[in-house]
From Swiss-Prot:
This is UDP-N-acetylmuramoyl-L-alanyl-D-glutamate--2,6-diaminopimelate ligase. It holds the Pfam family Mur_ligase_M. The modification N6-carboxylysine is found at K218. It is found in: Cytoplasm. InterPro entries: Mur-like_cat_sf (IPR036565), Mur_ligase_C (IPR004101), Mur_ligase_C_dom_sf (IPR036615), Mur_ligase_cen (IPR013221), Mur_ligase_N (IPR000713), MurE/MurF_N (IPR035911), UDP-N-AcMur-Glu-dNH2Pim_ligase (IPR005761). Its main location: cytoplasm. It comes from Chlamydia pneumoniae (Chlamydophila pneumoniae). Transmembrane segments: none annotated. UDP-N-acetyl-alpha-D-muramoyl-L-alanyl-D-glutamate binds at S30, T151, T152, S178, R186.
Amino acid sequence: MDLKELLHGVQAKIYGKVRPLEVRNLTRDSRCVSVGDIFIAHKGQRYDGNDFAVDALANGAIAIASSLYNPFLSVVQIITPNLEELEAELSAKYYEYPSSKLHTIGVTGTNGKTTVTCLIKALLDSYQKPSGLLGTIEHILGEGVIKDGFTTPTPALLQKYLATMVRQNRDAVVMEVSSIGLASGRVAYTNFDTAVLTNITLDHLDFHGTFETYVAAKAKLFSLVPPSGMVVINTDSPYASQCIESAKAPVITYGIESAADYRATDIQLSSSGTKYTLVYGDQKIACSSSFIGKYNVYNLLAAISTVHASLRCDLEDLLEKIGLCQPPPGRLDPVLMGPCPVYIDYAHTPDALDNVLTGLHELLPEGGRLIVVFGCGGDRDRSKRKLMAQVVERYGFAVVTSDNPRSEPPEDIVNEICDGFYSKNYFIEIDRKQAITYALSIASDRDIVLIAGKGHEAYQIFKHQTVAFDDKQTVCEVLASYV
């Protein structure tokens, strides 16, 4: 596609003479620009892309998209106050609107997105509906797997990944849709056929400012699904009604406590998994899963209702298939080589931590205790730090450590967390490896140890460097040293 065709009708001001030059790529990284590319001068937390516009030109950029006009640049400039949405518009057009060629399923919610998307993908694949996946752990485009750290990729990458899925003959894509991605316009010009709500609890107030704005961002996804599509809602979520009100498409519901189209009853929890009865219409079907905890029953229900309502497949067959599914990496990931069970989990919000600890508390032997290693990420929502401490304090003994401190001093983050404790039933160890070592050293055979906050992540982010660090690997190394 040439530049003149791409910019025709675009929602932005165009400066400079637009010529029919071939567009080869769109990118935010000036170092990756080559001849024929459009450079997206995005302003991030650490760097301003406008500072690298000259570098992009030197590398061969034929146009620059920005929120700021630069009169000293002799190149086509595409200017708009909402650069992320412009990036989405240009990228979707350049890649010929790939989401319209896929059955696009978006999953939003504070917690559970990764588990639900992985379950839906596994089920679709089992029904010979090959699907792609865009999520926190990885992006599966078909044959290729990409790990870039984004829950929802940047607009140019999102459209590029979707186009790759089309080329690799995927029928569907299941994607995590973050509140930030919705509020910023990152998923604009993406056509959603199905939207799924897991739950809405406190998170990302550093970005959204207020909880009401955060809820509104989540609810936006359901307004993007056309009447020909479908929305799937957890009716037990306190903010389900706001999402339902936003919907133009038919609503499918699931839940445990309240009335729903797909409902789980008779839930039995154990260390080996969960048993429950699925109630759908007149059908009552006994189910089992290796997933642990009541909160995971919600995740299972979200996947079951989405796939069953989409494919209209045999429900009993679907339940057999989901019963064989395993949790994603870093989601209550067990290490059973020591004297007591150790679990690695990504829980990094108060609600997620509460859900995990509720599930583990029910598995505790008499006289046992929960030992929880956790911290909070730097440069992120500070309001949840005290709340995280209060959650852990209700269930067991806390070992407070660093998570991904980013630009903040780890000691400052830990001190803010500890302001939330009412008692002195906690221990501070800033070094995460030493914190894990300490927790394992004090655990008895009747205890359960939870290493929370990082899950699948194999790194720690500090102010000036990112270092290799894997919670599960660290646990295994420490336990092996005891032998």
